[in-house]
A protein has these predicted regions:
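Symmetry-related core transmembrane helices of the 12-TM Major Facilitator Superfamily/SLC fold
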Residues: 265-287, 550-570
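Cytosolic juxtamembrane N-terminal segment immediately preceding the first transmembrane helix
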Residues: 2, 8, 12, 16-119, ...
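Glycine-rich segments within core transmembrane alpha-helices of 12-TM secondary carriers
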Residues: 228-254, 278, 431, 522-533
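Extracytoplasmic
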Residues: 105-140, 245-253, 396-403
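Cytoplasmic helix-loop-helix junction between adjacent transmembrane helices
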Residues: 200-239
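Structural signature of the two symmetry-related core transmembrane helices
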Residues: 172-186, 452-471
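Conserved MFS/SLC helix-loop-helix module at the cytosolic interface between two early adjacent transmembrane helices
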Residues: 156-195
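Extracytoplasmic gate region of multi-pass secondary transporters
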Residues: 124-126, 373-438, 500
């Protein structure tokens, strides 16, 4: 037998290189990347597995920028097909106007689900001052207790919804929350006492946990370079449901009154005719048109090549029962699965310094007690929790307090309780631009300064909200004018909602394999913050004649700013820095 000549060996090597080039090109150009098994085991796909001989110097520079979180924005990316990270299937771009794209569909369903949930969750607030309070003969403390019940329930459910998202996927969890929340929303019409009101509002607050599913769903579909923008737009526009419900529920109540129904019956008819149908309709849309993950089913989420890269880098991948069953089924068809580390070669020593970041390879995994302890030991997680506690917590408290404040300060023949509620609704509508802007700026800073940029932006905006609250409190204790109060409300809303948007881009980076769990912790913090602020408002209600109505606001502002300050220490280089 003739031995292989050096020329034959070189020819075979060149042929193999050509095949590898073709496989990599096809994978990168695939608008809907498939599973890792598309590539031959050991094929270079990126990061530690990538061989630099396939990239020019310019391509390497661009790739380095992308690895750091930069992806050049183009207006056309809003309607063109999503550009996909082949490692994890997430989109580098934000194609919200390409409705047939799975990434756009996930964004809009998450947003609409969040919107109708908040519309229903806050549906009692606009009817409370005039209709519900009078009909049930409630005292002011009872109204406050009802508001606190609606916040406490959400905090509990958010802690449960987070791990559920990591285990079952955010799509299924969101649909379940909407369906469950529709039940007490319909039963609201049967309330006849303060105790019944507390119970109904507690169970309606299940809907507040959709914040967790919204964030987890968007984080599942969008890459680190754009996740802040995607989450902020979804969170901001979805949260507007809390502002829209004021106009919607009051308008519906007035329609029933004009049709001849009594106030006793009018407010009760509002719940089964608006929130309930909206919740059930959107839940059906999510189940019919939604997608669990870019890979398809939630049990298929580890089938992107990033899992293979993570295994090659020595990371341990936890598979749940449904995933193991999926891999066993696929293994029967072909012996190519990312769960088998032996199929993937180890990294070359020369590439050891270019390990792929965990944020690019991680997929959500069921939470364990050990991993939970690791998460709770991370000061960056507590920073996110505290900032959301202070910002979203204030939002929920202000949604309940502002109508009463404006009515008490400016009540007249031309300014009724309904007028005060409409004016207060402008606070929630600031979410239209402020939260999205907070996320966009966060992504821009991340592209230039990394996680440090995101954190600075979050801390500055959260601290500024506290300063604005102090200003409102001092102003209301003097001789306030309507325009002046509204300007302070604008400042408080803008700074607070910017901080919310800034917060949304951080959990997916610091804990990429437990996005749901961290989002649940952060979201629960927001509800605890609402209880904190409502407690301050209840302890210091204030009196108009004594010019003490603003005291509770400046106290809340001092608490806000003081609680943010310690986290600036995370930015100091040295032993205690975590950035």
């Amino acid at each position: 037998m003739r031995s292989a000549s050096p020329k034959d060996s070189q020819s075979a090597t060149a042929s193999n290189d050509s095949k590898l080039d073709l496989e990599i090109t096809e994978a990168r150009n695939d608008s809907h990347p498939g599973m890792a098994s598309m590539l031959r085991p050991g094929t270079n796909t990126g990061g530690v597995i990538t061989s630099e001989e396939y990239m020019t110097e310019d391509e390497k520079k661009v790739q380095d920028l992308k690895d750091f979180g930069y992806h050049k924005f183009r207006w056309s990316s809003l309607w063109q097909p999503a550009e996909i990270n082949p490692l994890n299937g997430k989109s580098y771009t934000f194609p919200i106007f390409r409705m047939t794209d799975a990434y756009s569909t996930a964004f809009w369903l998450a947003t609409i689900g969040f919107f109708v949930a908040f519309l229903s969750w806050f549906a009692f607030s606009p009817l409370m001052p005039e209709a519900v309070k009078a009909d049930l003969k409630l005292t002011n403390p009872q109204v406050t207790h009802a508001n606190m019940a609606s916040l406490g329930g959400t905090a509990i459910v958010r802690l449960i919804a987070g791990p559920a998202c990591d285990r079952f996927g955010p799509r299924k969890v969101m649909a379940a929350l909407l369906i469950l929340g529709a039940i007490p929303s319909g039963l609201a019409a049967l309330v006849t006492s303060a105790g019944g009101l507390y119970a109904v509002r507690f169970f309606i607050s299940i809907l507040g946990a959709t914040f967790v599913t919204c964030q987890a769903w968007c984080s599942t579909f969008y890459d680190k370079s754009v996740v802040g923008t995607a989450n902020a737009f979804s969170g901001g526009w979805g949260n507007m449901g809390g502002g829209v419900t004021i106009a919607a529920m009051i308008g519906l109540f007035e329609r029933y009154r004009a049709a001849g129904y009594s106030p006793h019956l009018s407010w009760r008819l509002c719940f089964p005719t608006m929130p309930v149908p909206c919740l059930l309709l959107v839940a059906g849309m999510i189940l019919l048109f939604g997608k669990d993950h870019p890979a398809g089913k939630w049990s298929q989420r580890h089938q992107f090549s990033g899992t293979a890269v993570a295994i090659a880098q020595g990371e341990k991948i936890e598979l749940d029962a449904s995933e193991r069953a999926e891999y066993e089924r696929r293994a029967a068809d072909r012996e190519k699965g990312p769960a088998k580390a032996a199929n993937f070669r180890a990294a070359d020593p020369a590439d050891a310094g270019k390990r792929v970041a965990t944020v690019d390879t991680a997929q959500s995994e069921p939470i364990t007690f050990k991993r939970l302890l690791v998460i709770l030991a991370d000061p960056r997680v507590w920073m996110c929790i505290m900032c959301y506690l202070l910002t979203f917590g204030l939002e929920t408290a202000m949604d309940a307090a502002l109508p009463g404040l404006l009515f008490t300060l400016f009540q007249s023949n031309t300014f009724s309780a309904i007028d005060a509620a409409y004016a207060a609704s402008l606070y929630g509508l600031l979410n239209l631009y402020a939260r999205p802007l907070g996320g966009v700026v966060s992504d821009l800073l991340f592209s230039k300064y990394g996680l440090r940029g995101r954190v600075i932006w979050l801390l500055v905006t959260a601290f500024s909200q506290g300063i604005a609250m102090i200003g409102l409190g001092v102003y209301c204790n003097r001789d306030p004018q309507f325009s002046g109060v509204m300007w302070f409300i604008f400042l408080i809303g803008t700074t607070g909602f910017l901080a919310n948007g800034a917060n949304y881009g951080i959990p997916a980076i610091i804990c990429p394999s437990a996005i749901g769990t961290v989002s649940g912790l952060v979201g629960a913090g927001g509800n605890v913050g609402g209880l904190l602020y409502l407690g301050i408002f209840l302890a210091k209600p204030g009196v108009k004649k004594a010019k003490t109505l603003g005291t509770k606001f400046w106290i809340a502002g001092v608490v806000n700013s003081g609680a943010v300050l310690p986290f600036f220490a995370l930015l100091i280089p040295g032993k205690f820095s975590v950035l």
